[in-house]
Amino acid sequence: MAAPIQAEHFTSAIYTLLDETFDNVYGLYLDKGTSLFETLATISAEEASIPVGGQCATLAAQVKHVAFYLDLLVRNVRSGVNEPVDWGKVWRETSVVTTEEWEASKAQLRDSYNRLKRLIADTTAWPNEDHISGTIAPIVHTAYHLGEIRQALCTLKH
């Protein structure tokens, strides 16, 4: 039987992976300057409003979706209720954004990310696999969308 991981070691690793994904690249899996917020800082509202491909979402929709996902996760964990949601709403309703709307979306994402970090800070134990996978999921989910955004930028900026 494997030795259990101490909660503080797991939490520290989660914070490191979150930081790499959202803010500060350590080279664990991203290249320098490619975290989510570093990437978003290079995108104008006009670029964020362009659908990449015929039926594809805009980058603005990608950002709103990630914030929506993080907020939903935090609410569900805090309340203990998995509320039903319309996963398609953000994709249907988000397209062209003004500069002000784009900046507000990025700020909302930052707020959502900070709420997730507070939730993790409030977690003193990782009692089962569901808690652990639920903590890893936002890293994986956000990394997926970061990849989508970075691939779209190859089309939009080149």
Task: Name what the model sees in each region.
Residues 1-30, 37-40, 45-90, 126-158:
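Short, contiguous alpha-helical
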Residues 22, 29, 33, 109, ...:
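Hydrophobic alpha-helical core bundles mediating ligand binding, dimerization, or RNAP-core interactions
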Residues 92-126, 130-142:
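Acidic/histidine-rich alpha-helical segments that form the ligand environment
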